[in-house]
Amino acid sequence: MNTIFKQKNTHPFSNAANRLDRLPISRVHFQVLTALGIVYFFDLADLFTLSNVAPALIEHWGIPLSTIANVTAASFLGMFLGASLGGRLSDRIGRKKALNLFVFVFSIASLCNAAAWDIPSLMTFRFLTGFGVAAAMVITNSYLAEFFPSSVRGKYISFCAMIGLIGVPITNIVSAFVIPLGSWGWRLVFVWGAVGLIYFFFIHRLEESPRWHENRGEYAKADAILTRIEEQVEKEKGPLPAASQPKVSETVKQNAGYAGLLKGRNLKITIVLSAVWIFETFGFYGFASWVPSLLKSNGVTMENTLWYNVLHSVGAPLGALLGSMISERFQRKWILAASAFLTAIAGLLYGMTFIPIMIIVFGFIVNITERVFTSNLYAYTSEPYPTEYRSSGSGLAYGLGRFSNIFGSLLVGFIAVQLGYISVFLFIGGCWLACSLLLIFFGPNTNAKQI
């Protein structure tokens, strides 16, 4: 089934996009979802370990909210560097090799968090965890965007996010049980984050991205991978339809760098996506990272805070499931704009009550609408860029969002201490409203476009 084409410029061409696009969803695709779903699961779980542990650190180490802000800032500095450098590295050495490296980094770093003996050591380990987590997330989304057919790309990226978001309530439940065990209980939460190493039992299911090989001019390698995939799909689904002919305008671009993200059409995409990720990060982590500490600082017991967090987070996988179901039914920019607006409203209402049932209800709604947003944003961020810029571009946008939260964490801490509890939620709501407006006026349409 070798189908290496010749273009008018005499370069051979493996036609990866068209060959992948005409494949029916099969066992091969679900094997990819399983392996990358594990990455998503522990990647997202690790993002929430610190917010769960923070009230225990305040109680057992006697530290103020401002110190938690510093630890959080270190995490986001690591995320910025991980997303920016990890995406670039995967463009150079391949999606699979880079993903293996960074899953190992964030899993081992999470285990090291459990051994932290003071704030500087915890900040160091959180920096390394953030570095690995963000790099792995960017690479996972690039791989999914390049592997799944364009007609269902967003649906399955959102579905993978749903698998990952199941890790959020499970992590919160683990935290609620182990943290109260004693002054050492919080350390077990970080041990849980290291279980992501089980990914390495599934890496044999992953091929290198054939589109990455093709973009480097390694047509024979791309064709060999595509042929193996096609043979597996044919055994399960029967004969495949012929792939469309490659476009003669497609050429090899192996040495794309960051400078190309600031030129032509890429410049607008980079500005819009970076701004959306910055406001999303302020809004998302302003809520997720700070709510447990804010509730405890306003008189809610640590046990109640942990269980409120569990009940809130049940909405996370439900939101991602809903996001997956509607991802291809509407343009993603409008799904994103609407869900950001609803998150702004629910977040504001959350900050206006201390009635337990209302805290649970509004927190649950925030988790649903925010996860509809996030699960579609991961797909949306990977789509507008051409292959040679995909990981670098999405990594830069994602990374700038994480970098901004170095200051966002300090800003939320300042607002909480100086302006009060409700002011934090006014800030969070404003960030989500800014996301909505940016997407309405400047977001590109991306659904079902071949990338």
UniProtKB/Swiss-Prot annotation:
Name of the protein in question: Putative metabolite transport protein YyaJ
Chain ranges passing through the membrane: 30-50, 61-81, 98-118, 125-145, 158-178, 183-203, 271-291, 306-326, 334-354, 358-378, 397-417, 422-442
GO molecular function: transmembrane transporter activity
Principal location: membrane
Topological type in the membrane: Multi-pass membrane protein
Residues in the Cytoplasmic compartment per record: 1-29, 82-97, 146-157, 204-270, 327-333, 379-396, 443-451
Chain ranges on the Extracellular side, renumbered to this chain: 51-60, 119-124, 179-182, 292-305, 355-357, 418-421
Record keywords: Cell membrane, Membrane, Transmembrane, Transmembrane helix, Transport
Pfam family, one: Sugar_tr
CDD domains: MFS_SV2_like
Family in the record: Belongs to the major facilitator superfamily. Sugar transporter (TC 2.A.1.1) family.
Intracellular or extracellular location(s): Cell membrane
Cellular component, GO annotation: plasma membrane
InterPro entries: MFS_dom (IPR020846), MFS_sugar_transport-like (IPR005828), MFS_trans_sf (IPR036259)
